[in-house]
Each structure stands twice: as C-alpha cells, then as structure tokens.
Amino acid sequence: FDNNDTNYSYHHYGCTDYYKIDPRLGKNEDYLRLSQTAGNHGIKMIIDVVPNHCGGSHWWMKDVPSSDWFNVWKTYTSSNYRMTAWTDPHASETDRYKLTHGWFAPNMPDLNLSNPLLYDYLKQAYIFWIEYAQIAGIRVDTYPYNDIKTAARFIQTLRDEYPNMNVVGECWVKTPAETAYYQSGNNNKDGFDSRLQSVMDFMLKDKLQEAFKENEGWDTGTAKFYSHFAQDFVYPNTNLIMNFVDNHDIDRLSTAYKNVNEYKMALAMLVTVRGYPQIYYGNEIMLEGISGDYQGHRFTFPGGWKNDKRDAFTPAGRTKEENEVFDYLKKLLHYRKNNPVLQNGKMMQFIPENGVYVFFRYNEEKTVMVITNNNDHATVLDTKRFAERIKDCEMGVEVTSKQAVDMKNQVEIPGKTVLVLELGFWR
C-alpha cells in the first residue's frame, strides 16, 4: 500500500492509504494486472495484513477520527517487545499492556484495534483488496503486538468471509512451545485460539543458518535439527508450519554460508522437512545482504531494473555458482510441487551418527529418504539401520541428479551433501 512517509517508506509497513498502491510501484490497476498475470501461471497472491500500526503520515493523522483511534501515552513509549508476556503464566498485566500498547517504532502510530470503527475500517479495507485483486492468502504482521484476543477475532472475521483462505502469522518467538501457542487448534491452558492456521518457524531458521558450519556434537551441527523436530509434539498441525532460511528482517543465508555446498544443504532441508517452505527472492542465486547494513538485505533482484548491470533472470546473467544453486533449487521445488509426500507426508527421523542425519517423508504411495552428510569428507552409510522405513526396497533415485542408488547394503554420501532419494523408483 501507499507508504508516503519521510523515511523508511520502502519497507511498506507504515501504510498511509489503505486503498492505494504506492505510486512508486504503480497504480491499483497495475496490482490487479499483476495478480491476474500470476494467476494465469498458477501463482496465487498473498497480502500482508498489518493491524498493529500505520504510517505516521497517514492522512487521518491530520484529523484523528476519535481519541482512542491510537494507543496514546503522555510521552512516547515503545513496546517492550517481550512477546513472552502472552505465554508467561506468571506475567504481569503491566508488561502485557506495554507490549501491546507501546509503539513498535516512533514513525508508526500504534493502532487500537479494540476501537470498533477502526476494526471495521481495516476489515473493509482488507476485504476490498481480497475481492479486487483476487487475493488467495494472508500474512499477519507482528501478530503478538496486538491485543491477541482482539486480533484473533479480527482474523476470524476475515476467515468467516473466506473460509478456504490460509492465514499465516508472524510470531517471532524463541521456542516451539511459544510458536505452537499461536497455531489455531492448539490446546492452550488459557483457552486462547489465535485463528492462525499457520505459524512461522523462526527457530528452524536459526538452525538452518548455523548447523552446516558447525562441527558435529551432542547439540551442534545436524543434532540441532534432530532436537528441533523432536519437539513437534507441541503443534496441532506440523504440515502448516512455514519454514524459511531468511527474510527481509534478518541476514540472508549467503551471510551464513559462502560455501555453495553448505548453502545447497540448507535449501535441501528447507524444501524437504515437514511444513512448507517460504522462498525469499534471491535465495535462488545466493543474493547477499546483512540486516544491519542499511537494510542491505533488501537489495533488488539483479535485472529487475533498467539500470542494473546484469540480468540474473537469465543463465547468462548469473555466475557459475549462482546457476548451480538456481538449478538445484528449481529441481527440488519442482519435485516437491509434484509429490504430495513432501507436502503432507509423515516424517520419521533418526538420531544423527558420525555426522550424518537421516529422515524420511512418507505416505501410503511413496517414501523419500533424505541423507545429510555434514562432514567435509565422504561417509559410508549402512542402510540396515533404517530397515523399518526402507523395508525391502533395493533401489532409490536422487531426485535432483536422477542417479540410481543401490540401497541394499551401504550408500556413500559425498562430504557436505544432502541426498534426496525417492525409494523404489525406476525410469
């Protein structure tokens, strides 16, 4: 939406007109045409819903509709940003109040969603865009900074209008238990239900950026994945957990891994583990960016603008390493798209041994074995340990290379490599 603020306006989280596309990007009609064109290619559009704050230059700041339109303090007061205040059974109301009523940033006034007129205004604005631009999904920004009971009612209002629409919430917390608290259907002791079908796995992001540059240990390297997924019992639906390796708020994956093989390992995990992947533009070419570097992680994709020195949309405009990553991720995503076993199949994992972590995705029709070798050297894996899932399968095919793999006794995995094997697969 329009973000006509004096600074930081490029991030578009400080809306100044809920019914207007930022003119630097185009007109409303251009956005509609984008959605229609995407739909013609089988791509659905998702809208970012921000009920917590608006831009300081919004036109209503000149004539505030009511005294309680915003959360107002005698002097500027920021949020304490302690989202644990909602899940902490010992939390004080003072801390919860400051979390929700304190401002996220000085240039973004904190909206009082409990005001019924504001509630209806935002509801109608988002329904307008869903209808006008044929929006298929919603991402709710900074969900826990709202009064969460009001936010849940707001999300349910939209879901009542669009019962088949998925809603994912940004709940940037630090433990699986806290994340699960915000997934709809969880049996929370306080009875709270967020109405968010999907939640974002920020903890997995940390592990994806760390594990492949660490030595293997009890709780380092790939053991981090094992321990993380072992806590999935707290979630009501692991298929609707959104996974990612980076996004617009944090260092890009390329900051963590300069080694192409390690970078590819993180992408392989992203695409094959339970839940569903979010791909941030530039992941496919190792686009660089550091969060503290003047928001440098939000660099534009090379070739999208007429003054760009190269066009990374084409193979000729990409380096050898970029093409390697691009082709690898493309093959993984195509496989995932065409194989429900990676979309909603069950997952079974085995404790990492000797630097190798193995897990399976499986359903009644298909079994996929993912072998992660975090060693710098090739490692031989005895397949007998995994008999309960491999069963009597004698062959597998690595889905990105199409190479056949003999599963009868031992499999050799190159160093710093992930093998994604479809078992019992021949062509």
Question: Which residues fall in each region the model found?
Answer:
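Substrate-binding/active-site clefts of carbohydrate-active enzymes
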Residues: 1-128, 132, 151-160, 177-178, ...
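The substrate-binding groove and active-site-proximal loops of carbohydrate-active enzymes
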Residues: 12-27, 104-119, 136-145, 209-218, ...
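Active-site-proximal helices and loops of the catalytic beta/alpha 8
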Residues: 35, 53, 125, 131, ...
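Hydrophobic faces of well-ordered beta-strands that scaffold small-molecule active sites
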Residues: 45-47, 138, 167-169, 243, ...
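Surface beta-strand/loop "capping" patches
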Residues: 345-365
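Asparagine-centered strand-capping/turn motif at beta-strand->loop junctions
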Residues: 371-375
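Solvent-exposed beta-hairpin/edge-strand motifs
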Residues: 385-401
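C-terminal beta-strand-rich structural cap/linker in extracellular carbohydrate-active enzymes
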Residues: 407-427
